[in-house]
Amino acid sequence: MSKFSFNINHQYKKARSGIITTAHGNIRTPAFMPVGTRGTVKAMLPESVAETGADILLGNTYHLMLQPSAERIAKLGGLHKFMNWGKPILTDSGGFQVMSLSKLRKITEEGVSFNSHINGDKYLLTPERSTEIQHLLGSTITMAFDECTPYPATFEEAKTSMQLTTRWAHRSREAFVKRDGYAQFGIIQGSTYEELREQSAKDLIELDFEGYAIGGLAVGEGQELMFKVLAPDFLPQNKPRYLMGVGKPADIIGAVSRGVDMFDCVIPTRSGRNGQAFTKYGTVNIRNSKYAEDNDPLEADCLCPACQNYSKAYLHHLVRIGEILGAMLMTWHNLTYFQNLMSRIREYIALGKDFDFTT
């Protein structure tokens, strides 16, 4: 089995392109990870997700621990077999969802106690339990358990939260079962305070994670402030850097130019289900009546099924009447667009060219 590794093949200014080698195959970077929260990318077959060019997708610890449970998925052979996905899977730690979805939650040094948003059952999620769940799922890349600092936060609030994340990172690292081809990433926190993010990075580097994530951003602070405190330069040059929850094309391009390697976001899938398509000419709201008799495809040179086989008029019709096929085709197109964007970014880095495109 291959060892987990990251090789940078090309670098232009701060932007890098390379290959992450894992037990479940290679990941070309910079990489965009479609979000498969509950063991599925909404409105897509797993093989269709692969056809868009995705090398890796994201699963969610919080949702999978509630339904159908990590133990059941392990009994059935792990998440890869369960959902018929043979490529790498990264699972988040569950911390963000606990904070955002569970209204009745209590944070202590031990972890987070919360009530399920599904049936009200009480749970305790600790660094050890989060790491165990991800191991049961068979995650290729496991995330350390963290507290996603609420925004806005005062300096002292952000410092207290960041220090808790650091202590939890120590426990997550101790609980992680090291195996060839598998990895665990630590998560940098610190809200919008560069000083705290630098300290968080220094603390987590001591734990020698296989990669590092930048968490707690894209939560309302705006692009300018996000880029100001992004701080990938604080992280090791030879390990992957993952900006969590960021997926607007302009944000991806800006973050890559600052040295980030991995991204995930629900934007392409959620937007697709809501009738919004990403194109190189800008976004298209297919619900708009001006597309009712438009016989042209979304993008003539796009190779996705939506563009190769159907007109904007047909997609308009499907979305307006709420047909499932509309959500499927729009999602397929958006995921293809995002993978094409990443491919173009990798090509520009290899050629040593500035990113002269915005979408």
UniProtKB/Swiss-Prot annotation:
Cofactor binding summary note: Binds 1 zinc ion per subunit.
Enzyme category, top tier: transferase
Cofactor(s) of this protein: Zn(2+)
Active site residues of this protein: D92, D264
Enzyme Commission number(s) from the entry: 2.4.2.29
Ranges for region RNA binding: 245-251, 269-273
GO biological process: queuosine biosynthetic process; tRNA wobble guanine modification; tRNA-guanine transglycosylation
Pathway(s) where this gene product acts: tRNA modification; tRNA-queuosine biosynthesis
Name of one Pfam family that matches: TGT
Top-level division of the source organism's lineage: Bacteria
Subunit structure: Homodimer. Within each dimer, one monomer is responsible for RNA recognition and catalysis, while the other monomer binds to the replacement base PreQ1.
Family according to the record: Belongs to the queuine tRNA-ribosyltransferase family.
Protein's name according to its UniProt entry: Queuine tRNA-ribosyltransferase
Organism, scientific name: Rickettsia bellii (strain RML369-C)
